[in-house]
């Protein structure tokens, strides 16, 4: 068993599969979750021959108890957990390709996009922290996107991504001094099998030959986990293409992916916790000054 153990949720295809195989290439023991045993086997096969290994675990991330059981199984097998990659996501029926307004979509989209795409990540972080904090080390990564800042897909999609960034930021405050770090990653356009199968040279004007491979995202995460400056980055949102360029990382074909920063209105909303100057006064300090604490209802 490798000394480094990772959990990649939603690892049966796409970004999750790419991250898992890249981590295995870097020597990690990687547990991947998904609802389809057959698709999970595909991820295991994709990592065949790598220095590390991929171990599949079936999990319905809409159920808290199954997430808890996954982390417990990993600890029972290996005694530790060094990396959590929150990638699992549910695509509501008719969501992909939908160009209408938010009020034209079913309200039930909330349960998929924020239930699995947000709640499941929170539950996984809670369980991972119970392992990482006592061992004094670890990294928790949320897979986010530029949809956190710019209108993208639907209102609920953007809400879920902004919440993931804020989650990483606030968790970093509470994890300060424990040796555990949290990050949120803004991925660009990803060259998944679905995108490549369309046979296009560009996607909404963005050249596919400079988009990101799923494995590129995995290389970025592997580099972050080994980065000596990681504690100083904790709580921040990082653009994968920009970090990858800085570290000399490339796609499978050797190309360097482009950042989407200019196309979507700028950079991340949350800097590292170490750079944040909160300056929040206590309730007693506000009362003594005769002021209002600024919080609704306060």
Residue positions per predicted region:
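Rossmann-fold cofactor-recognition segment
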Residues: 47-65
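A short, exposed helix-loop element centered on a Lys and neighboring polar residues
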Residues: 125-126, 169
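Catalytic loop of short-chain dehydrogenase/reductase
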Residues: 90-94, 104-109, 139-163, 168-177, ...
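Short, well-ordered secondary-structure patches that form non-catalytic structural/interaction elements
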Residues: 99-111, 115
């Amino acid at each position: 068993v490798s000394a480094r153990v990772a959990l990649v949720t939603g690892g049966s295809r796409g970004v999750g599969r790419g991250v898992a195989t890249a981590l295995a290439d870097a020597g990690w023991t990687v547990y991947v979750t998904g609802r389809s045993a057959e698709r999970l086997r595909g991820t295991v096969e994709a990592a065949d021959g790598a220095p590390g290994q991929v171990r599949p675990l079936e999990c319905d991330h809409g159920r808290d108890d199954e997430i808890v059981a996954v982390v417990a199984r990993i600890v029972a097998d290996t005694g530790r957990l060094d990396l959590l990659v929150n990638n699992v996501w549910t695509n509501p029926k008719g969501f992909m390709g939908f160009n209408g307004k938010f009020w034209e979509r079913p309200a039930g989209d909330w349960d998929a996009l924020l239930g699995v795409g947000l709640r499941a990540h929170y539950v996984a972080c809670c369980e991972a922290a119970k392992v990482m904090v006592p061992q004094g080390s670890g990294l928790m990564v949320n897979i986010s996107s530029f949809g956190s800042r710019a209108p993208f897909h639907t209102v609920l999609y953007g809400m879920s991504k902004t919440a993931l960034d804020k989650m990483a930021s606030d968790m970093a405050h509470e994890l300060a001094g424990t040796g555990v770090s949290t990050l949120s990653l803004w991925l660009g356009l990803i060259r998944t099998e679905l995108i490549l199968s369309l046979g296009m040279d560009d996607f909404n004007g963005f050249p596919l030959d400079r988009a990101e491979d799923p494995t590129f995202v995995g290389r970025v995460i592997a580099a972050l986990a080994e980065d000596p400056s990681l504690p100083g980055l904790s709580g921040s949102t990082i653009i994968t293409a920009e970090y990858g360029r800085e570290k000399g990382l490339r796609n499978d074909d050797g190309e360097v992916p482009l950042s989407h920063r200019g196309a979507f209105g700028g950079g991340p909303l949350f800097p590292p916790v170490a750079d944040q100057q909160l300056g929040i006064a206590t309730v007693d300090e506000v009362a003594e000054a005769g002021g209002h604490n600024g919080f609704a209802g306060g």
